[in-house]
Amino acid sequence: MTSINIRKLSHSEMDLYRKPLLPETWSCFPVDKEIDTQSLKKVLQKDLDRIRSGAEKDPFSNSITMLALDISRRLEKKKLNYSALEALIQRLAVGSFGLRADRLKKYIGEIDRKKNDKKLKQLIINLSSEGNKQIPFSEFKKKIEKNIFGIVLTAHPTFGMPSKMLEDLANMATMTKVDGKKITLKELKVIIKNIFKTEQRPDKNITLNYEHLLSLKALKNLQLALNSFYKQIIITVSEIYPNDYLKITPTIFSLHTWVGYDVDGRGDISWADTFNKRLKVKLEQLEIYLETIKGIEKTVQEDKLILSKVLIIKKELKESLEYNLEIYHTLDEEGFIDNIKLIQKISKFMFENKEKLLTNTKKLFHQINEILILVNQSKLKLKKKVLMDFQLLKIGMNNFSLGLARTQVRLNANQLNNAISKEIDLHGDPDDPSNKSTYLNSVSKLIDKVSPVKINFGTILTENMNAKRFFMIIAQMFKYIDQNQPVRFLIAECDFAMTALTALYFAKLFNLDKKIDISPLFETEKALATGHLVVETLVKNQHYRKYLLQRGKICIQTGFSDAGRYLGQPAAVLSIENLQRKIAKVLADNKLSSIKLLIFDTHGESIGRGGHPVSLEERLQYINCSYTRKKLDEWNIKLIQEVSFQGGDGYQYFLNPDLSYAALTRIAEFCLRPNQKFNDDILYNSPDFGVEFVNTIKQFNTNIMDNPNYAALLNVFGSNILHSSGSRAIKRQNDSGVKTLVYHPSQTRAIPQNSILQQLGMLANSLGGIGKFLRKDPKKFEEYYNKSERFKRILDSVKYAFAFSDIEVLKAYIDSFDPGMWLSWSTRTADIERSNNMKSVANLLESFDIHWRLNKVYRELHQEYMEIRDWVLGRKSKGRIAVGRGRVIEKEIRDELLLMHGIRVAIFHELFLLSVQIPKFSDQAGVSRDEVIAKLIRFDVPEAVKILRTIFPVGKEKINYSDYGEKSDYISEKDINYTIEENTIFKQLEALHECAKRVSTGITHFIGSVG
């Protein structure tokens, strides 16, 4: 069963399905029941092959543009209709989803639970011995109880498919259901059939609640996987240390979440949202503890004393759930945030019932230990099982406390700087050399004399500074949700030591410094270059040094997404590992090897944001390289590694229990593999090569980021060709008319920017600069690729990016804006009306004057692409060598991807032709016809159509002119019913735009990630 090719099976099932693929409930166009998508796909594929073969003789032709024009001609001659195109898009998107399931299965490795049990057991056995000798139990206990790896779930906007499909993806990859039962071939076909009846787009109106609930599902599966892992540890240890196995409380892994607690760049998350999301995480954990106790209750029925004590715990957990639910439902009420009386009421309720809320696990631990003494003395039939169940419960409480995961909050450095500015008279840059020391000394003096203050929920309501309010929320979470579990305090874009020191000041002010771990995030170009200096300044500050020694660790976060956007991903990954080593060296040089270095590498599933495409094992090696681990060992710096799994794309590994367990096994293999030796790597032995590699790629990407023509490329297409894939809105800074065709790329976040590049067929963040570096010395480049394990791992991502990129695709999209192409096309079109519309499009695009700008970027990227092509496919290859050869994906799959691009270019052409058919109108409400068309040309169709419907209404109530005492036969323009325009232009624009966005979903499936 596991060898089934799901992509091919999906296509064969769609061939056998004789009904239309598209239900009328959500189809964009009237369903054509006679469509044969299999035949249509073959016809267009033959067209593409024919165009390619003829194009070898014509260096100026473009196979994707030619395919799009061929589709347009078929539409013009009625040999093809929009309904057929929509159905074909559905087919290709479903096939690409099958490919995604196949890829996930391969990416995760061994999925069979019993085989993974054996792998984990062997890892535990290996930990218990050194040099073929069993180590003392005390040493083993220290090893097994260390926290060495953290899994962090985030709410990044990568929810690119319906949640049901996301769960189907996990189930198909494992061929198991959530209950662990195997999926039969018949059941798999039913899943596929349901998928091709599903609209290929994310769920509509994604909210923070939606993201949070999905993250809870993932966390529950992760806990199940961890409990299975811990059970395997106890079973194995019982065989190695039979007298001591119940004395261990293994940790190794920790679970974290920032879903609902990340307010960096978000003004839509209130303090009540954050508090309530944390409370929900507690409620779910209490439910797990209660269910465990209920299970134990059934096994101790014969011993009334033990049963009575178990029932006491059960009663306390149920009572805690009831009281916490009362708070949760109150805070969840609509309008709560503005209802002062309700806030006062629930605040008093919390204060008066604090003991019943259960805010720490000390009492539970004490009760369980008392019961364990009785169990050991008892003659219970299921004594061994009861001991195991209680031990697992204790391990769970030790690791999870009162929440499915540990809390990580995040805000932006600017929010902290603003909050402290008045107190230290901060003006301008905190790192300004003329004031830097003054600012640092001022914050230190504040810490010298700070005294903790008391706050309540009323204090939160009256505080205007976001940063201070956030500290207050954390204080209340400790007070009323969980007193014990530490909170990570992440500071985004933390380029200055003063900012982290400010966080410490506020932590002390609100009496949190013993419970939170401040973690600066280094992701900008400046931070990656100077982050170690920030840390050096902090560790030399007496207050921060004392704080670190007290916490026993220093926490930092390194961000691959923005680093990849600004520097290029190949340069970013090397810059990040270099920074991590520099920070470790700072700790060693400042005699701080007694504290642990916690590095949270935040990255996404896409290669542009730090995800490695080959396997989960390769991904872990990619972000946490062996050379860095070697240097940390030399400096005696203990490492705790954390990685992020961002949004829906990240949760995919944890929406099926067997998949979660497999993922956890791969991570355990990475962390616990014995005798991990570093083999000498030519990349580190010859640092000049690596430095020049980074600098070349960095130079290319920083230049292109500041290039207004690159900005134009991103802005013309923009996020309007994408469905919204998260609760965080993606809007341009300026959104009016023709003049907004150019802006700066930094105004777009990493995910949408990467998404746009994916959709344009050019993964520039991973490719840019590689060609330039290749040109310098191809032989040396090849030598390092063959001899350096690290360099090859980085370049494998480049090869993957190349496989899903095509310079002709980019050119086809760009040439949609070429007035010359439209004029040439108009002269070869028999339909006079359509020809005239093409001339109108040409005139329109001439006035926009954008094509030449896009072409300049194309030429720059073309040079990069061709150098990489020559390296991947061989310099002897000429012309348009067949797609697929020498690439990491086969030709058939790549051709399906190119078909999707060709179809969408044709859709864009149809959109442009419809745009110029809008009736002329005088400016209304400050909006001109040119501005509306400008919105359409940059694919902001919903907003444009909304404006048009206001100007050209349908079915407007008619005024009876006979009631005014005198006759009138005048017909006002307002009395005209624009039903024809509605049906032939406005609805068509919306439908075509939706189809274009569904293509985006399909392309996302092909590549395997959003952005």
Feature-to-residue mapping (PLM):
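Catalytic core of soluble alpha/beta enzymes
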Residues: 521-573, 577
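Acidic, glycine-enriched catalytic cores built around paired aspartates
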Residues: 4-60, 66-118, 125, 129, ...
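Secondary-structure transition/capping motifs at alpha-helix termini
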Residues: 240-247, 479-485, 507-516, 538-551, ...
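Extended, highly charged
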Residues: 2-250, 272-362, 407-410
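Active-site-adjacent "gating/activation" loops or surface patches in catalytic cores
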Residues: 262, 468, 483-484, 497-503, ...
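Hydrophobic faces of well-ordered beta-strands that scaffold small-molecule active sites
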Residues: 407, 487-491, 514-522, 554-558, ...
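Short secondary-structure boundary/capping segments
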Residues: 274-276, 412-414, 421-424, 503-508, ...
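Structured, charged N-terminal subsegments at the starts of enzyme catalytic cores
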Residues: 143-147, 154, 253-270, 323-510
